[in-house]
């Protein structure tokens, strides 16, 4: 075989080192451009990450294959790179040696190649393209198998656009058919072959799809004809892991050949006689098949090169048309069909729907997989319908038919009459295929957006209803409970509420249920469940002393042990709070933002409140995991929302500590029956306990910062090393830090 093949085969083990991302890219590219080997592609893939840019560069001719005949000067860096680089072929490409030798020399062993070739993941398309690639031909008897026509042999320079090259080259087509010695020149033609292979190959498949049964018996008589069919069939029957480009090519059915590659002149003659026999039978179905061909080509082009615009495609298809005409002068029988095909292709190129964005690729691929004949496609995006269509009788297609699928869809999707009208107007000017496809995409997109909108609306509706019902419940509770409970101390409430109190206690014992208002962790506000005091509210809500709003940190309420003063205090302020936010934090936990709405993540609570061992609760000393080392006091009396008359903290810290203890004792000793006067006047306005606490807390925080700064400054003056700033670790101000 050719040196190129030997090189790549020799190194086949090294392809295992290729990382999977690169490998999948190379797979895809080898399918789109059959005559580029993976070796050719490796360097491009390594140089450009994005598949689309690579495809653009290859199709526009900015990048050409490395080959022995003509080395374009600009691309020398590629050659150097490629010579140094150990060649890494595709393990699972069909083995070109197998395909080509059996094709040319002995046609009878039609099954061997596919058994040898290690590819599970390629469809028939892969095999055919392999056979068609001119890469490895050396001897004269190897015939280039590109659908019976010769791929132009002119090397592609960087300057000529490949469209120009194609049109020039069609002159050579007919004479070159049988003698095929010019191997090297063939090597040089990069782009034209790859584009045309893709399309011709597509056409062949489509034609074969049409006539499975007619030719079943002929396979036995003519192994030469059937060799390619069997190849495709066996490869198709293995289970496959496919790259997306492979998926995009329509699934092969059992295959018949109408226009086979010109393998040699004798077979060509045999073939022509066959065609004469079949002609009357297959006339109608072949017209249909031709139309399908064009559509399938369009689809493949669109999936393969979603980023290309129309300008790119026009030259490609035109070049193909010229070639087809040149070639089919030999196969006189098919001329009429070709004419139709060409018209349709021109139309397709002109059609505005042609440019398909990457977003729509998904839609397309699914359409291609189940590939219904286009004329029966009820292009409603429901897979069952698509899968039924191939069994329906197939009629030759008339351009008027696309209006039928529309009428079928209209009852199903009455929501979109306007869109469909627009579509109909557009579509009367468009060719069959582009039309059906565009419609399919648009419909399926509409379908999805509709569904999303409906779901969204339903969710909103449910949420609103929940919210309303909660508001009502809450209002009822407020009406029933407040009077009786303001007279009861909390401890005498019904056994049920005590049970709830115990549950709350149990839950809040554990750290992660954010029982400390200061506790936070990074994801905390991402879920609705974790707004600040939320746990308390949910569980204590039914003890209608809805504690949460009264006293922000409501350390105690869950425990069922706080005295009557809290109960009364809570009720007075809870009524006000209820007026303000009718659905408590239960319905919308986010409302409850503990620090007066401005949530200061660290300063406001990190230093003072974050850790459990800082805050033994009075009533509950036994339940709390940690105790303070000095006799049990905590630094700010937030419990009942009284304002602590903060001592002047600038004075000596010890006096401050002792004063605090005294104020605590006073608070504890107040008789339980009589609620303390809650509302104080500030600026002539009543201050609710929440605000008091915020003022107090903020004041303490300021003190603490000032103190820390002062201590640090003093330490700096005295030359004490940095960390030792003379804190008294027992004093209240330094405790939250360490």
From Swiss-Prot:
It comes from the Eukaryota. Residues 69-455, 467-503, 640-688 are annotated as: Disordered. Residues 298-328, 337-358 have a biased composition (Acidic residues). Residues 103-121, 224-237, 380-455, 467-498, 660-688 have a biased composition (Low complexity). GO terms for molecular function: DNA binding; ubiquitin binding. Transmembrane segments: none annotated. This is RNA polymerase II degradation factor 1. The lineage of its organism: Eukaryota, Fungi, Dikarya, Ascomycota, Saccharomycotina.
């Amino acid at each position: 075989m050719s040196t190129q093949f030997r090189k790549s085969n020799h190194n086949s083990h090294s392809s295992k080192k290729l990382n999977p991302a690169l490998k999948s890219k190379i797979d895809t590219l080898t399918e789109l451009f059959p005559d580029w080997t993976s070796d050719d592609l490796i360097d491009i893939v390594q140089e450009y990450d994005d598949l689309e840019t690579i495809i653009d560069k290859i199709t526009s001719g900015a990048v050409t294959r490395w080959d022995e005949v003509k080395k374009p000067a600009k691309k020398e860096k590629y050659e150097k790179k490629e010579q140094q680089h150990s060649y890494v072929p595709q393990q699972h490409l069909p083995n070109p040696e197998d395909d080509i030798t059996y094709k040319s020399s002995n046609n009878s062993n039609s099954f061997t190649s596919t058994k040898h070739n290690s590819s599970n993941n390629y469809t028939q398309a892969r095999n055919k393209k392999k056979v068609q690639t001119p890469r490895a031909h050396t001897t004269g008897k190897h015939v280039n198998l590109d659908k019976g026509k010769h791929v132009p042999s002119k090397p592609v320079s960087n300057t000529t656009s490949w469209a120009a090259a194609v049109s020039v080259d069609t002159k050579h087509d007919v004479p070159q058919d049988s003698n095929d010695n010019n191997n090297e020149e063939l090597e040089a033609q990069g782009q034209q072959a790859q584009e045309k292979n893709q399309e011709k190959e597509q056409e062949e498949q489509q034609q074969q799809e049409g006539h499975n049964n007619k030719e079943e018996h002929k396979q036995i008589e003519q192994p030469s004809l059937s060799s390619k069919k069997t190849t495709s069939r066996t490869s198709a029957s293995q289970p496959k892991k496919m790259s997306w480009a492979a998926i995009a090519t329509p699934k092969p059915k059992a295959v018949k050949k109408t226009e086979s590659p010109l393998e040699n002149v004798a077979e060509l003659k045999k073939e022509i006689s066959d065609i004469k026999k079949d002609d009357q039978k297959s006339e109608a179905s072949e017209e249909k098949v031709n139309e399908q061909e064009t559509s399938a080509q369009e689809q493949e082009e669109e999936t393969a090169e979603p980023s290309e615009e129309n300008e790119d495609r026009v030259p490609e298809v035109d070049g193909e048309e010229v070639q087809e005409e040149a070639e089919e002068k030999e196969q006189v029988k098919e001329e009429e069909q070709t004419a139709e095909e060409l018209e349709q292709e021109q139309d397709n190129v002109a059609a505005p729907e042609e440019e398909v964005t990457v977003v729509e690729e998904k839609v397309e691929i699914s359409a291609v997989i189940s590939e219904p004949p286009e004329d029966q496609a009820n292009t409603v995006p429901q897979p069952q319908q698509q899968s039924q269509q191939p069994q329906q009788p197939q009629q030759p297609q008339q351009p008027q038919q696309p209006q039928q699928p529309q009428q079928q869809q209209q009852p199903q999707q009455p929501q979109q009459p306007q869109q469909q009208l627009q579509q109909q107007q557009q579509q009367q000017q468009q060719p069959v295929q582009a039309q059906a496809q565009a419609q399919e995409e648009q419909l399926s997109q509409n379908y999805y957006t509709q569904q999303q909108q409906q779901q969204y609306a339903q969710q909103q509706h449910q949420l609103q209803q929940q919210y309303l019902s909660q508001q009502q419940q809450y209002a009822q509770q407020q009406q029933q409970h407040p009077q009786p409970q303001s007279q009861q101390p909390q401890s005498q409430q019904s056994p049920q509420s005590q049970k709830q109190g115990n549950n709350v206690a149990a839950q809040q014992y554990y750290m992660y249920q954010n029982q400390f208002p200061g506790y936070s962790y990074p994801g905390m506000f991402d879920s609705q469940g974790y707004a600040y005091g939320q746990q308390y509210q949910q569980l204590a809500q039914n003890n209608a002393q809805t504690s949460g709003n009264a006293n922000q940190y409501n350390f105690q309420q869950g425990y069922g042990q706080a005295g009557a003063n809290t109960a009364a205090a809570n009720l007075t302020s809870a009524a006000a709070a209820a007026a303000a936010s009718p659905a408590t934090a239960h319905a919308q936990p986010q409302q409850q933002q503990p620090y007066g709405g401005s949530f200061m993540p660290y300063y406001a609570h990190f230093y003072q409140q974050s850790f459990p061992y800082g805050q033994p609760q009075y009533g509950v000393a036994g339940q709390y995991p940690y105790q303070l080392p000095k006799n049990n006091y905590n630094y700010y009396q937030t419990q009942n929302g009284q304002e602590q008359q903060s001592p002047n903290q600038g004075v000596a810290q010890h006096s401050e500590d002792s004063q605090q203890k005294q104020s605590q004792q006073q608070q504890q000793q107040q008789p339980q029956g009589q609620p303390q006067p809650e509302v104080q006047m500030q600026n002539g306005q009543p201050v609710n306990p929440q605000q008091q606490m915020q003022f107090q807390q903020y004041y303490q925080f300021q003190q603490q910062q000032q103190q820390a700064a002062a201590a640090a400054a003093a330490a700096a003056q005295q030359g004490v090393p940095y960390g030792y700033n003379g804190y008294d670790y027992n004093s209240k101000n330094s405790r939250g830090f360490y």
